[in-house]
């Protein structure tokens, strides 16, 4: 018996875009709220308006941007602008109502809605948030959504998803926006420097606080400092600039690094603060100033090997030193970030630090002194 397998038919992007403009009544242009200008397509906007279609600007990832900045963007894009966070399901109700209102203004009880935008701005995630179901394929890799798909918003309103709309322009911007897959980029250093330069121009304190480095210029020397801070070294002991650059791009795309300061007090809000079950093993430990020796010492205790249910982040004063511990995060790098942010929050000068794994738990320890203001 022969089984027929249904496969997605790859449809040219331009053909799908033209189909959206021709067939849909309302078109959602999805932009990255962190940098809307970089992710907009003015040529497409003009074409949509020339066809007499309703255009709604959807600024996704708005939860990463301060409210006063969003208000400035609304002045730029006008009243047909909606701020959403598809990931957190924020603003989607307002978007649904704006779609219905747009159709009503057109005198239509039924209608079709098209969604366009660059890869990784969140088109498919917005569809999922609007419909309440995972009806469209989603992913962080550029070009995952394939072909043409219709999904139902209401009984009378349908949405059509589309692959990212690409135009020939600066290759660095294509890398930054996610339109070009990072693993295929031969030289990630220029786009990484472009991200750092934009952030530096917006607020030059953000890079210093996020990476914990001092710098004068945005150049390869800054990349070296960041790479050294992250311990991204080659076998020869040199800073791995390619890995450093790719990390900067990835963390920007993931929303970890952006134009706006993170509230450090909120960074560890879901973490237990009681680390006494760890520090009890450090009483009378003679090398408390050495973070690496602390971690090595803790490996001797079986009670720390079982996977904990909830990550822990906290600090404790031992023999005149402040010991900061992050324990149980998904990665060692996540532990490191928690520790560094807590040290900044509590004004602790770090003298030694080290991360490793104890059984099923990642751990990162920093030892320092509290700086008097």
From Swiss-Prot:
The record, for PANTHER family, names:
GTP-BINDING PROTEIN-RELATED, GUANINE NUCLEOTIDE-BINDING PROTEIN-LIKE 3 HOMOLOG
Against PROSITE patterns, the record matches this protein to:
G_CP (PS51721)
**Entry's InterPro entries?**
G_CP_dom, GTP-bd, GTP-bd_ortho_bundle_sf, P-loop_NTPase, TRAFAC_YlqF/YawG_RiboMat
Pfam families attached here?
Answer: MMR_HSR1
What is this protein's name? Uncharacterized GTP-binding protein MJ1464
UniProt similarity note? Belongs to the TRAFAC class YlqF/YawG GTPase family.
Nucleotide-binding recorded as keyword: yes
Q: What one GO molecular function would you report for this record?
A: GTP binding
UniProt domain CP-type G: residue ranges:
14-168
Taxonomically, the superkingdom here is Archaea
Q: Which UniProt keywords apply?
A: GTP-binding, Nucleotide-binding
Query: Which residues are recorded as binding GTP?
Result: 117-124
């Amino acid at each position: 018996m022969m089984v027929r397998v249904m496969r997605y038919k790859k449809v040219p992007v331009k053909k799908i875009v033209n189909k959206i403009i021709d067939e849909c009544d309302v078109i959602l242009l999805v932009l990255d709220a962190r940098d809307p200008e970089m992710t907009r397509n003015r040529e497409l906007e003009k074409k949509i308006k020339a066809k007499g279609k309703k255009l709604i600007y959807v600024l996704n990832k708005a939860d990463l941007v301060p409210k006063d900045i969003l208000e400035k963007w609304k002045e730029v894009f006008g009243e047909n602008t909606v701020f959403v966070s598809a990931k957190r399901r924020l603003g989607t109700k307002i978007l649904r109502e704006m779609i219905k209102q747009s159709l009503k203004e057109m005198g239509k009880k039924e209608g079709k809605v098209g969604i366009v935008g660059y890869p990784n701005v969140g088109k498919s995630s917005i569809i999922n948030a609007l419909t309440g179901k995972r009806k469209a394929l989603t992913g962080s890799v550029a070009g995952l959504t394939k072909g043409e798909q219709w999904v139902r918003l209401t009984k009378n309103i349908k949405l059509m998803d589309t692959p990212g709309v690409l135009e020939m322009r600066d290759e660095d911007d294509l890398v930054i926006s996610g339109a070009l897959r990072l693993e295929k980029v031969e030289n990630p250093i220029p786009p990484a420097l472009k991200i750092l330069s934009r952030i530096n121009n917006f607020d030059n304190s953000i890079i210093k606080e996020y990476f914990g480095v001092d710098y004068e210029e945005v150049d390869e020397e800054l990349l070296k400092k960041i790479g050294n801070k992250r311990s991204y070294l080659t076998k020869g002991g040199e800073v791995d600039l390619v890995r450093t650059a790719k990390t900067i791009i990835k963390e920007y795309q993931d929303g970890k690094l952006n134009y706006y300061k993170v509230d450090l007090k909120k960074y560890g809000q879901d973490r237990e603060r009681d680390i006494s079950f760890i520090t009890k093993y450090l009483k009378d430990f003679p090398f408390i100033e050495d973070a690496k020796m602390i971690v090595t010492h803790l490996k001797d205790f079986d009670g720390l090997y079982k996977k904990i249910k909830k990550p822990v982040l906290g600090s404790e004063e031992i023999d005149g030193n402040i010991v900061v511990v992050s324990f149980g995060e998904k990665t060692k790098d996540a532990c490191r970030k928690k520790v560094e942010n807590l040290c900044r929050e509590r004004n602790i000068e770090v003298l030694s630090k080290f991360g490793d794994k104890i059984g099923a738990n990642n751990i990162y320890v920093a030892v320092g002194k509290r700086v008097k203001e």
